[in-house]
Amino acid sequence: MSVQQYDEIGEAFEGFKSLPLVRYGEVPSFLGMVGDVRGKSVLDLACGTGFYSREFKRRGATDVLGVDISVEMIAVAREIEQREPLDVRYEIGDVSELRPLGRRYDIGVAVQCLNYAESAAALERMCRNIHRSLVPGGEFFVFCQKPDYRFDCASLDKYGFLCEPTGEESETGPRARVTALLDPKPISIVSTVPRREVYEECLRASGFSEVRWVPLQVSEAGIREFGEDFWTDLLAHPPLEMLRCRA
């Protein structure tokens, strides 16, 4: 189902990065966690239209490969690469069936990727494929919906999103509908919110160590733009969280 959802979104996915939660929360938090990529190779899993792939290349990564299951997303990423060449490579691929890549990468990143696994076994399979694609000691960074997010807290609409439970429960956790309030047409995506222990157990079983959760933050630019009070509800109940570990 996730393939169809993202194929239908296509280039509109780029608009997500302009919404306050993403622009001033997700992007600076995630890039800050990953840190210095100069001279390193990066594997971007569920790369979408290539936003982070391009950003890592601009920041000095030597080799960046973006992989996504959506044909349409990869088509858009390649189109952008043609218009603004950065020497980023993209390929269509399912992380749960990731092919041997012919080399190992220094850094792996997965933004809203592992939460599309339909079961704990599928999530562990994703993690094993990622682990074998990284150099020993390589770092893996995850950005995902917060496992224990309270859906009954203040609305996220002023930050550009709605996050609602669908009422369904999967093997790994509740299912949720996230709506990006884009103009002129909002876009909704349904995925699972795996429990914290599911992530941790699957990563460790796949050979990862030093598993650590990292909280979402708001950038100084976001505070200057909107003021501290604007972000109070978001920081009291952040809908997103990050995770880092080592291969």
Predicted ranges, named:
Residues 1-37, 51, 55:
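Conserved class I S-adenosyl-L-methionine
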Residues 31-43, 140-142:
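Mobile, glycine- and charge-enriched loop segments
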Residues 43-45, 49-97:
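Class I SAM-dependent methyltransferase SAM/SAH-binding core
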Residues 99-108:
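A short acidic, Gly/Pro-enriched loop at the edge of an enzyme's catalytic core
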Residues 107-121:
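A short SAM/SAH-binding and catalytic strip from SAM-dependent methyltransferases
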Residues 124-136:
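A short glycine-rich, Lys/Arg-flanked "PGG" loop and its adjoining helix->strand segment in the class I
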Residues 141-202:
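SAM-dependent methyltransferase
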Residues 202-247:
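C-terminal lobe and adjacent flexible extensions of AdoMet/dcAdoMet transferase-like proteins
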